[in-house]
């Protein structure tokens, strides 16, 4: 019996859920060329505008000249280079934790933590809107897996009472498709009352949130006692690639010994670690980037309200415009593209059915004038989409 892949693909196309990759023909930045069209992009996760920063580029070049290109082997064989080690130490200091551990991707970091800490007889409790990598990790770890209602401490408490064995509460810090924040103080209090650990994937919080860009944990003034496992990615606000886990000495050593996605993966190129060290320096030195970004967020939300757009409750650079129907979301995205603006339509299964949206993301690299162009285009296009409702 053959795999009927053609039927699966046709079904997805018929439901307006078929996804295609835009071909980027320039570096990351507000002004890009994609699919042979000059566009003003509002869909990148380069929140602080560091992905194409000349100092970061130069650090990568110098790193490649000194350390070569490939990692060569896994960290435990001979792939753990000095730049990797220096970056881990810098990230530990940045997060205020004893140690940090580098991973090649955020997906691998999340998979590594959950599968290394939990097994049969244990419990993992996750927010219903967590990132796919966290949900996959919960399914693969062998523990009892339960999802609590989004950001709902009462729902979490009910599940904590039924938990057995070692219990890990897992949440996004900033929810990637909604832009809202996890209510960490309340969630951590519930977990602590039941002797459970808390793991936060702050992929979208590091950089934009916190007085020094330290993310949602810094934003709420929490520490290692409240959030035992802190995960961050380096391909978003840091503008480079990879991810890290920060925590106690015992946590990091446990991951080195037992986390299969860490043990059996070639290390990232050491030159990338050199670039990330520079981007971390810029993130901490240039506070104006966060300040400018906050002004853009405030202006976008004000302008969107004037247009009558349905926004979600987000204080972050992620500003989703809720459309509902997938076909209408695609139409709004296409209308904007006709006007030289690139904003992606996010549809099921990435988001729940009936909640298709345009995921506007803002960057410190955007100017106020560029943001006004987006608002003007939305004011023109939104009535056309509403007419199809």
From Swiss-Prot:
> Kind of enzyme, top EC level?
transferase
Cysteines engaged in disulfide bonds, as pairs: none
Recorded hits in Pfam families, A to Z, give: Aminotran_1_2
Q: What is this protein called?
A: 8-amino-7-oxononanoate synthase
This chain's source organism reads Ectopseudomonas mendocina (strain ymp)
Required co-factor(s) are: pyridoxal 5'-phosphate
Any one GO MF annotation of this record: pyridoxal phosphate binding
Protein family? Belongs to the class-II pyridoxal-phosphate-dependent aminotransferase family. BioF subfamily.
Alphabetized, the UniProt keywords read: Biotin biosynthesis, Pyridoxal phosphate, Transferase
Q: In which pathway does it act?
A: Cofactor biosynthesis; biotin biosynthesis
- Residue positions annotated to bind pyridoxal 5'-phosphate are 106-107, 176, 204, 233
User: For substrate, which residues are the binding ones?
Assistant: 19, 131, 350
> What Enzyme Commission number(s) does the record list for this chain?
2.3.1.47
List of residues that carry N6-(pyridoxal phosphate)lysine: 236
Protein's GO biological process = biotin biosynthetic process
Q: How does it assemble?
A: Homodimer.
Task: List the catalysed reactions.
Answer: 6-carboxyhexanoyl-[ACP] + L-alanine + H(+) = (8S)-8-amino-7-oxononanoate + holo-[ACP] + CO2
Q: What does the organism's lineage look like at the top? A: Bacteria, Pseudomonadati, Pseudomonadota, Gammaproteobacteria, Pseudomonadales
Provide the function of this protein: Catalyzes the decarboxylative condensation of pimeloyl-[acyl-carrier protein] and L-alanine to produce 8-amino-7-oxononanoate (AON), [acyl-carrier protein], and carbon dioxide.
């Amino acid at each position: 019996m053959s795999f009927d892949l053609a039927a699966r693909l046709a079904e997805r196309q018929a439901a307006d859920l078929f996804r295609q990759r835009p071909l980027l023909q320039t570096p990351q930045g507000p002004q890009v060329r994609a699919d042979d069209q000059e566009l003003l992009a509002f869909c990148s996760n380069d929140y602080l505008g560091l992905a194409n920063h000349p100092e970061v580029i130069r650090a990568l070049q110098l790193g490649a000249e000194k350390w070569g290109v490939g990692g060569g082997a896994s960290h435990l064989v001979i792939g753990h280079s000095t730049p990797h080690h220096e970056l881990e130490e810098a990230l530990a200091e940045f997060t205020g934790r004893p140690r940090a551990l580098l991973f090649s991707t955020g997906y691998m970091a999340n998979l590594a933590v959950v599968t290394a800490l939990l097994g049969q007889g244990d419990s993992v409790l996750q927010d219903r809107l967590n990132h796919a990598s966290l949900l996959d990790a919960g399914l693969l770890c062998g523990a009892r897996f339960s999802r609590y209602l989004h950001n709902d401490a009462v729902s979490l408490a009910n599940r904590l009472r039924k938990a057995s064995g070692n219990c890990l509460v897992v949440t996004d810090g900033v929810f990637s498709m909604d832009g809202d924040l996890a209510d960490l103080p309340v969630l951590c209090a519930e977990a602590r009352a039941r002797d459970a650990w808390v793991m936060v994937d702050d992929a979208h919080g590091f950089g934009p949130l916190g007085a020094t860009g330290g993310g949602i944990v810094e934003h709420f003034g929490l520490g290692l006692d409240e959030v035992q496992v802190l995960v961050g990615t380096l391909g978003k606000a840091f503008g480079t690639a990879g991810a890290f886990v920060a925590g106690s000495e015992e946590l990091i050593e446990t991951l080195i010994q037992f986390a299969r996605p860490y043990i059996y993966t070639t290390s990232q190129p050491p030159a990338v670690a050199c670039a990330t060290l520079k981007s971390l320096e810029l993130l901490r030195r240039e506070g104006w980037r966060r300040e400018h970004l906050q002004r853009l967020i405030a202006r976008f939300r004000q302008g969107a309200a004037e247009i009558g757009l349905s926004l979600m409750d987000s204080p972050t650079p992620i500003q989703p415009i809720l459309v509902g129907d997938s076909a209408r979301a695609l139409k709004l995205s296409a209308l904007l593209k006709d006007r030289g603006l690139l904003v992606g339509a996010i549809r099921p299964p990435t988001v729940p059915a009936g909640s298709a949206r345009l995921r506007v993301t803002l960057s410190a690299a955007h100017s106020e004038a560029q943001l006004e162009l987006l608002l003007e285009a939305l004011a023109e296009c939104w009535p056309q989409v509403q007419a199809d409702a």
